[in-house]
Design a protein with these regions (language model features):
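Conserved phosphate-chemistry cores used by DNA topoisomerases
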Residues: 1-228
């Protein structure tokens, strides 16, 4: 996950029996054009590989993943442009160098909310916290609450600037608890279909993702049906 501060809250909110947190500092390396033999020269990538228990491999290979330590590998980043860029860089790493984990359905993107809506007790209903992924969800939530006769003064809206702003209970509820979190499974095209590879080459080749097109790269990949 992105950030040391958020990592501390996540470690407190996780289920220690089966969940582990690996905080990453800043943006990881764009590995699209990095030789596989040089990957472990990067500390973050080395730590990722060791943590999940799988060695890097080439697209199309079917390595032994019997030592895979976790059934779900979830990418957690802030719900902003920088966070989307980090997601793209990690997706690039997993697609190019750990592709079998994508093929077998082990890679997910965590979808933290942008907004929290709080309302007080009303009748038999206790006070509530409602999390909204985006402005569209926020609008629908506010409209629904007004139909329940909540006033503008009773509807308190907070915006999260990042994962680090959430306390451990909020992070647990929105991103860690299997009953309440939202995850987007990452899937790739059918074997032999090189459409995904061509798209990745356009977006990540020649260090494009490190320049002004990073926001575009994040948007295109997150909306590409190959990855959804």
């Amino acid at each position: 996950m992105e950030g040391d501060s958020a990592g501390g809250s996540a470690k407190k909110g996780r289920d220690k029996e089966y969940q582990a947190i690996l905080p990453l500092r800043g943006k990881v390396l764009n590995t699209w054009e990095v030789d596989q033999n040089l990957l472990f020269g990067n500390k973050e990538i080395h730590d990722i590989s060791v943590s999940i228990g799988v060695d890097p491999h080439k697209i199309g290979e079917k390595p032994d993943i019997s030592n895979l330590r976790y059934g779900k590998i979830c990418i957690m980043a802030d719900a902003d442009v920088d966070g989307s860029h980090i997601e793209v860089l990690l997706l690039t790493l997993f697609y190019k160098h750990f592709s079998y984990l994508m093929e077998t359905g082990h890679i997910y993107i965590s979808m933290p909310p942008l907004f929290k809506v709080s309302v007080p007790n009303k009748g038999k209903k206790k006070e509530r916290r409602i999390y909204c992924l985006n402005e569209e969800e926020l609008k629908k939530t506010v409209e629904k609450l007004k139909k329940e006769k909540f006033t503008d003064a009773q509807i308190v809206i907070s915006r999260f600037k990042g994962l680090g702003e959430m306390d451990w209970e909020e992070l647990k509820e929105t991103s860690l608890d299997p009953e309440t979190r939202r995850l987007l499974p990452v899937k790739v095209g059918l074997p032999g279909d090189d459409l995904t590879g061509k798209a990745m080459q356009i977006l990540m080749g020649n260090k494009e993702a490190d320049g002004v097109n990073s926001g575009l790269s994040a948007t295109v990949i997150s909306s590409n049906p190959i990855f959804n």
